């Protein structure tokens, strides 16, 4: 039989194990919508999860955040976890769009899959050394421009059940911090190693890249001044490879989102987005993907030579390219 307890002070609901004297924090569903898009009754901006809860004079140790326990808690910005938590269930923080920072407790052993899906505001997360297992797609469907910093405290990489996102470019947009002297161990890992991506600007061309040190691939990204104005002007040829400062060669495989937009700090209808200089561009055969709104508002762009091997042309790639033929 299932036994439940609701803490009246904060509304948190627990499933109690009478034999083990443990408690699991579970979800509280609110109103339902289509496709299981129900709201959460956890409406506060901050929750402090206790180490123990008491029901009818019996204490229960809180050891787990259940699956989807904070699902769609749209106001949630901060959660403080006790040292007693050993497991975080699948999808525990899905759609917590305001959650910005999370310090996971030492003693945590397992993090479930898709735990931080759609956490669009998440900026920092620390994974303690005690974590030994992480589910697949942990950061699935997050925004590339979040600039998430993931700090791992263990000297050896935790086991990961699969890629952390369905999008391969995820690793190029976020940062992994590991203990000093442990970089080699993480670089060798098939998943963690994908995070070893560095920014590099080719002074000869002015092109800015995200370099993946593991795959030896490059993504061409926006290069802007302090006001967000694009530094790309009359460019018409993009090279297939780039060498970093150490002479290591990387193959260009992708053009990033809004790469040639005139200004990235303006609204989509603002004229300062316009790039009025670029007229033609030739892309190398190594490019497999062109990102979202890559050439948006390149008003005088007339000719684009796309590679035959191109696999993905993202939405709004040539939006408002009013001079482009055919």
Feature map (PLM): residue ranges:
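N-terminal segments that cap or nucleate solenoid repeat domains
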Residues: 2-57, 68-72, 201-248, 253-260
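Structural signature of tandem-repeat unit edges
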Residues: 37-63, 74-87, 97-110, 120-133, ...
């Amino acid at each position: 039989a299932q036994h439940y307890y609701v803490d009246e002070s904060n509304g948190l609901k627990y499933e109690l194990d009478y034999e083990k004297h443990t408690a699991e924090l579970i979800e509280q569903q609110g109103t339902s919508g289509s496709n299981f898009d129900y709201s959460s009754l956890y409406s506060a901006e901050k929750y402090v999860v206790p180490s123990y809860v008491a029901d009818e004079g019996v204490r229960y140790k809180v050891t787990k955040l259940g699956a989807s326990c904070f699902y769609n808690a749209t106001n949630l910005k901060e959660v403080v976890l006790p040292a007693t938590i050993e497991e975080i269930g699948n999808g525990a923080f899905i759609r917590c769009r305001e959650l910005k920072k999370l310090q996971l407790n030492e003693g945590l052993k397992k993090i479930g899959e898709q735990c931080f899906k759609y956490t669009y505001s998440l900026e920092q997360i620390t994974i303690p050394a005690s974590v030994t297992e992480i589910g697949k797609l942990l950061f699935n469907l997050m925004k590339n421009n979040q600039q998430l910093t993931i700090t791992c405290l263990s000297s050896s990489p935790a086991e990961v059940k699969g890629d952390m996102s369905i999008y391969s470019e995820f690793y190029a947009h976020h940062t992994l911090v590991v203990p000093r002297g442990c970089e080699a161990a993480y670089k060798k890992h098939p998943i963690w190693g994908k995070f070893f991506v560095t920014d590099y600007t080719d002074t000869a061309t002015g092109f800015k890249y995200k370099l993946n040190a593991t795959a030896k691939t490059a993504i061409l990204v926006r290069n802007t001044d302090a006001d967000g104005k694009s530094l790309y002007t009359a460019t018409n040829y993009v090279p297939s490879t780039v060498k970093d400062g150490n002479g290591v060669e990387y193959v260009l495989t992708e053009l990033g989102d809004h790469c040639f937009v005139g200004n990235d700090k303006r609204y989509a209808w603002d004229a300062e987005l316009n790039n009025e200089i670029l007229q033609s561009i030739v892309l190398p055969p190594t490019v497999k993907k062109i990102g979202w709104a890559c050439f948006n508002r390149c008003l005088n762009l007339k000719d684009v030579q796309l590679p035959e091997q191109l696999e993905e042309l993202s939405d709004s790639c040539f939006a408002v390219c009013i001079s482009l033929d055919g």
